[in-house]
A protein has these predicted regions:
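Extracellular/luminal beta-rich ligand-recognition
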Residues: 51
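Conserved short beta-strand edge segments in small beta-sheet-based binding/regulatory domains
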Residues: 71-82
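Short, flexible helix/strand-to-coil boundary loops that buttress conserved ligand/catalytic motifs
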Residues: 65
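Short S/T/G/P-rich N-terminal loop/turn motif that feeds into the first structured element of a domain
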Residues: 1-48, 56-60, 80-93
């Protein structure tokens, strides 16, 4: 089974980045085995994080989000790389 990339947009509840970073410092990412962190970016106001995650299925992602749902509202998008998108669109060009 191929791995799936997910772009996860994390909206920090009450714009409280301190609570999120404190938990991360104390507990780590709290990701279940099989869910791989790829990279992340945080907006300048420290209100949201754009995080790229990789796994074989959505269940592990849902489990991980459950560990953070008291501090973060999540928006999830399944994504492909630009190279994969180019291959998908090529027959239509």
């Amino acid at each position: 089974m191929a791995k799936i990339l997910y772009m996860v947009v994390e909206h920090f509840k009450n714009q409280d980045a301190v609570a999120v970073y404190r938990r991360f410092r104390d507990c780590g990412r709290m990701a279940p085995e099989g869910l791989v962190y790829v990279s992340s970016w945080v907006d300048e106001k420290l209100e949201r994080c754009y995080q790229l995650m990789e796994t074989h299925g959505r269940a592990l992602l849902d489990e991980w989000m459950g560990n953070w749902s008291d501090l973060i509202d999540f928006e999830v998008h399944q994504v492909v790389t630009s190279q994969e998108a180019t291959k998908k669109i090529a027959p239509r060009l």
